[in-house]
């Protein structure tokens, strides 16, 4: 009857919500500016929840239907978490290149021994590295780049459709290339300071 149809519709809506939340929540735990250790986990979860409420209607047409078997449901959720973690980790790698550049600068300017607490990583870091990282996080919000990151998460449903297990080999290859390019970029950022240190 009508109650059965309503119950099935409600189940489908709840399933769609949690499927989107799995991807967005796991990505927001790692995104620069959102995933920093000084940002409360509760705040991140509330923001992920609010964003899921907005995004779910936008992507609901491309979401799979609620599977009958629990194992299929678990695989779907796991796939979304993998995609979210991958997207968050990639953006985190791009930010970590600044910390690497700062460390290179510190070692060539005799600042390596001057360690300071890095609030972004929750560990000790070099002075130049901390400065570059915190400046990058500040610029992300000042220039509204966080809007671009959030839009990219929504756009990820075109590149990585929900319900389709991502090709792990391709993801690993992409991550490896970004790490290599990131280290090269960090070296380029540090090169002027290294050159000055070698001259004096």
Feature annotation, model-predicted:
Residues 1-200:
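Hydrophobic alpha-helical segments and their helix-loop boundaries in membrane
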């Amino acid at each position: 009857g009508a109650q059965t149809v309503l119950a099935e519709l409600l189940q489908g809506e709840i399933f769609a919500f949690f499927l989107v939340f799995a991807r967005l929540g796991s990505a927001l735990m790692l995104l620069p500016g959102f995933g920093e250790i000084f940002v409360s986990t509760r705040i991140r979860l509330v923001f992920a929840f609010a964003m899921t409420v907005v995004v779910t209607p936008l992507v609901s047409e491309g979401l799979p239907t609620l599977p009958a078997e629990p194992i299929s449901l678990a695989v779907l959720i796991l796939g979304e978490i993998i995609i979210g973690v991958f997207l968050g980790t990639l953006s985190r790698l791009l930010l970590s290149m600044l910390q690497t550049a700062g460390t290179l600068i510190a070692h060539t300017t005799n600042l390596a021994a001057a360690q300071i607490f890095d609030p972004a990583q929750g560990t000790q870091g070099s002075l130049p590295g901390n400065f570059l990282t915190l400046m990058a996080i500040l610029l992300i919000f000042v220039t509204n780049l966080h809007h671009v990151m959030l839009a990219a998460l929504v756009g990820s449903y075109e590149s990585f459709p929900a319900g389709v297990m991502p090709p792990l080999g391709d993801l690993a290859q992409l991550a490896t290339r970004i790490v290599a390019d990131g280290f090269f970029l960090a070296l380029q950022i540090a090169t002027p300071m290294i050159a000055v240190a070698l001259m004096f």
